[in-house]
Regions:
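Catalytic-core elements of nucleic-acid end-processing and repair enzymes
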Residues: 1-188
Length: 188
């Protein structure tokens, strides 16, 4: 009789444990469904936010192009690309360049109207892209241009304002630039 009670006890425990596990699994499924729904909503909001930013950038692009593209192009016409090691450093010369890079790297070049700083002659915006790679693999940097033709590195950012694996290498190369290196095609 003692053996029978022990068997019944084990069977009861197993059934209780199984019922408990079934409840836990139900709760996990509910939790997972909630998490997945939350993620889907977040993705949709991110997508809508991104579309809105792109729409605003395109609208700004149209408005600015109508007003003063020539002024920006006049300021940037003497600045050309520079090739150093495995990188190509290229200035953003048009409003379209600013919009494209801003959208591609998901950074605030258009929203904060960096092209105005370039038009004023206060700074120059360049991309640093490894040879054979796309803009997303590179970084964007701002060079402050002083009246005596000295330059200094400002911001240096990659995709979504984060540094790339080449961040330090690019930074060190840019610090060696002189104003003369940026006028016309040159190799540092």
């Amino acid at each position: 009789k003692a053996g029978q009670n022990k068997k019944n006890f084990k069977k009861t425990c197993l059934e209780l444990d199984l019922n408990y596990n079934i409840e836990v699994m139900k709760q996990k499924k509910i939790r997972d469904a909630i998490i997945n729904e939350f993620k889907a909503i977040k993705r949709q909001k991110d997508w809508k936010r991104r579309r809105e930013i792109i729409r605003k950038n395109e609208e700004k692009l149209k408005n600015v192009e109508k007003e003063d593209v020539k002024t920006l192009e006049q300021v940037t016409k003497n600045f050309n690309h520079v090739k150093v090691d495995e990188f190509v450093f290229k200035p953003l010369k048009t409003i379209k360049d600013f919009a494209d890079v801003s959208n591609e790297l998901e950074i605030c070049l258009m929203q904060n109207e960096y092209y105005n700083k370039v038009k004023e002659g206060v700074s120059m915006i360049y991309t640093a892209i490894p040879k054979g790679k796309k803009i997303k693999d590179g970084e964007v940097f701002e060079l402050y241009v002083y009246p005596d033709e000295r330059i200094a590195l400002g911001q240096l950012v990659g995709f979504r304002n984060k540094p790339t694996k080449n961040h330090e290498k690019i930074k060190n190369i840019v610090k060696t630039f002189k104003y003369e290196n940026l006028v016309g095609e040159a190799n540092v």
